[in-house]
Amino acid sequence: MKKLMWLFVLAFPMAAQADYLDVIGFKMNPGCTMGKYQQIVQDFRDQWANARGYKVEILVPGQSSEVGMYYWVGRISNAEAFGKGLDAWMSAQSDPNSGPAMLMARFRECVTNQSRAGYITR
């Protein structure tokens, strides 16, 4: 019986995990390239996201009715962790010399957000 229990525990460690997904639809501003945007995203990872357990990937359309629409998909352990990170990010925006404010300025120069939604995985 113990072996069966351990098998279950080891085989399904993520069963109770419910990640939070932060999905932002955006379009590139004139003069911004995907290469430039990807560098901003990498700087965001290095300066902010990695320390908080926030992962991000960018979805680039391969087939879509809106080929100019891209998606930022951020993933973190749960909604509470996302909320704490977002609170800290927003608080830092009041200081234009803070890392988050400087990153946000670079994001705004490069893209315009069209939509934002949060999802919980099941």
Language-model features, listed with the residues they occupy:
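Sec-dependent N-terminal signal peptides
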Residues: L4-M14
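Short S/T/G/P-rich N-terminal loop/turn motif that feeds into the first structured element of a domain
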Residues: M14-D95, A105-R122
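Non-heme di-metal
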Residues: S98-P100
